[in-house]
Amino acid sequence: MIVCIAEKPSVAKDIADVLGAKTKHDGYIEGNGYQVTWTFGHLCTLKEPHDYTPNWKNWSLGSLPMIPPRFGIKLIEDKGIEKQFKIIESLMQKADGIINCGDAGQEGELIQRWVMQKAGAKCPVKRLWISSLTEESIREGFSRLQDQDAFKSLYEAGLCRAIGDWLLGMNATRLYTMKYRSGNSRQILSIGRVQTPTLALVVNRQKEIENFKPEQYWELKTVYRDTTFSYTKGKFTKIEDGQALLEEIRPLNFVITDVTRKEGKDYAPRLFDLTSLQVECNRKYGYSADDTLKTIQSLYEKKITTYPRVDTTFLSDDIYPKCPGILKGLKDYAQFTAPLEGIRLPKTKRVFDNSKVTDHHAIIPTGVYPNNLTPQERAVFDLIARRFIAVFYPDCLYAQTTVLGKAGRAEFKTTGREILKPGWRVLFDKEKQEDKQDDEERILPQFTVDESGPHAPELQEKWTTPPKPYTEATLLRAMETAGKLVNDEELRDAMKENGIGRPSTRAAIIETLYKRGYMRKEKKNLYPTPTGTGLIDLIHEELLKSAELTGIWEKHLREIERGQYQPAQFMDELKQMVTTLVHDVLSDNSSRL
């Protein structure tokens, strides 16, 4: 008998249907030589400190650092979990073979490996690796099962991540709580490898806002033929300098000195990875990162979209032949897919690039018709569907006109933009109107060199503005790029290696900061609470709050996943870091409160 183990009951049912397993038992489905069972996400977890030695049960500075000689796992204490595990254990003990059907990612690999280890599974194990839950995808996956050994590095990276989080979280939380909490306070100062640098980003931004001192400046503009031109030499920090130039040029004619027209093109937006989808949903609809993750997970389980926990915006070449069929399935978008029928779809490196795809490709529709969706599911699906269609549309062609002029010695400039062929933009016309992006197209009057006439100059008073508070959208981007502000897509791809956390965990980190009372949300804006600010002020060690240092850890974990970095080396470095941290904090006699 072959035992298949999935990550949740609904996925197990989809797999059982494809395999022809029809007989339902308590905790599994059987038939056609298969027993299909399931977990409920994590059934096992790393042991707690007191599971290793009674000396680590009570919190004390003398017991730090806590570094077990060998890490172990245990069942999560829950009656439902214990019951399901006994069923899984019984099936695996008698199995001729096991097929790991867990989510195709690092966390999914860890969940199932721990269960198999705890169950004492001894038979050969194969791995099902699929990017969607459609019948076609499941059948295709079972036709090319892989040996579990091929995913050893993925498991090792997940294990190192879990142990790293345990070592730093357990030791640093006890260390700071016992060393610095005041008097008889029972407050726990919770510190985490990812949550603390993320909180530091929000705290530091708030301090920048509070410490910001607005500075006054003036900009010189002039209006000629109902068109506003800007002075090219920048702003004035002294009003008298700007006023003097204004008075000098007021009586003079404005002369057009140069007119340049260049044609260019805008490419369609990239397909979504999880973070960019969360960013767009927060920007457009105000959905939290956690809400978006739950929604896209639901769409995946309904077989409507592909695997969501991805960090690439590209497709692999093997998806290309399936694209016409997916487009055909988008029946509600027939007005947009009709022009693509019967033509050879374009295949560009901006969309199809095997070198940019590792475990999974970008999030796209599967072609299954979306029935019975909630309004939120419908809104998220709409974003994904339109992006997918758009990448096969022609580029948007535009003409940019730059006009230079002068009045006396003062030089001015204005630019205009005219859409020549909208191309892919036709899919987003409604969105453009809703977002009031009326500056997208600015058509200038016809200007000719050497024409001249009266103009109306004015000096506009301005003030420098403070940085904006983070929203979930901008915080996700900052986590992705380790705190660096990056707008360019290509640079964003390069920075992903060093981001804080993983796409699949960032929403949970943000939710943790809310739940622990370290951060609050006001409308879309995020603010640290006094408790959150106090915690970051308390931490002097850059190791704990530096986004860049945490990003380097993430890079090593990704290298372990690719077999380019030794897990043992990572663990040795981690243990040394924790030991040094404990020593430094215990040696600190200053008052940080």
What is the role of each PLM region?
Residues 49, 94-99, 227-237, 242-249, ...:
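OB-fold/S1-family RNA-binding modules
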Residues 1, 102-104, 185-188, 261-270, ...:
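Conserved short loop/turn motifs at secondary-structure junctions
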Residues 2-3, 81, 118, 173, ...:
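Basic, low-complexity terminal or inter-domain segments flanking catalytic cores
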Residues 238-272, 278:
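Metal- or metallocofactor-binding catalytic centers and their adjacent structured scaffolds
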Residues 71, 80, 86-89, 93-94, ...:
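C-terminal or mid-to-C-terminal helical accessory/interaction module adjacent to the motor/catalytic core
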Residues 1-170, 453, 466:
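Intrinsically disordered, low-complexity regulatory segments
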Residues 9-16, 33-36, 40, 78-92, ...:
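Amphipathic alpha-helical transducer elements in NTP-driven molecular machines
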